[in-house]
Regions:
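Glycoside hydrolase catalytic-domain groove-lining segments
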Residues: 137, 154-171
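Active-site acidic/histidine proton-transfer and metal-coordination neighborhood
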Residues: 20-23, 38-143
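Active-site beta-loop-alpha junctions enriched in small/polar residues
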Residues: 1-4, 33-36, 73-74, 116-120, ...
């Protein structure tokens, strides 16, 4: 299940949801951190994006969810917009720095900050996932694998079986 409450909610309410889920045998799989842009070109939006992602990761850890999930962000106006600067070496480095800031600021005990693939953002392939994970170098950073988001060419479409096998083998 996804997390039914928002970050910033009362810790007693979080504890009640955590207990209710456990008692019912329900795993709270994720806390969505979508809508936040931790690599925004606007410094205020970037700082807000990082802070909000940290709050979501804290909630995930407190409610015993597996992860807080988001895309890496965009160099455009929106949090997940297409932009020519999204797939550059400088943006890759900025993603590494922002994810480190998110996870190092929270130091979660259980949950991970999981990055989801997108066709026009890093990670846009399994290999770029591996490159990011290696560069970020934090156990509290994880994978939220949505293979539909990397089926972006006729070759990948017609060979999705091989794509999936390769993805699971590598990840």
């Amino acid at each position: 299940a996804f997390c039914p409450i928002k970050s910033g909610d009362d810790s007693q309410e979080v504890a009640a949801y955590r207990k209710a889920a456990k008692d019912a045998g329900i795993l709270i799989a994720e806390v969505g951190a979508f809508g936040n842009n931790p690599i925004s070109p606007d410094d205020d939006k970037r700082a807000t994006g990082i802070s909000n992602c940290q709050a979501k990761l804290s909630l995930a850890d407190e409610i015993d969810a597996n992860c807080a999930v988001n895309v890496t962000g965009s160099r455009g106006d929106g949090w997940a917009d297409c932009h020519p600067d999204n797939l550059t070496a400088d943006t890759f480095d900025l993603i590494v720095a922002s994810v480190r800031e998110i996870v190092d600021g929270v130091k979660p005990k259980r949950a991970v900050y999981a990055i989801e693939t997108m066709p026009w953002l890093y990670p846009d392939s399994v290999d770029s996932y591996l490159d990011l994970l290696k560069a970020i170098d934090r156990d509290s950073c994880g994978v939220h694998f949505d293979p539909v988001n990397i089926v972006t060419s006729p070759d990948r479409y017609y060979h999705t079986g091989e794509l999936l096998k390769d993805s699971f083998r590598k990840l």
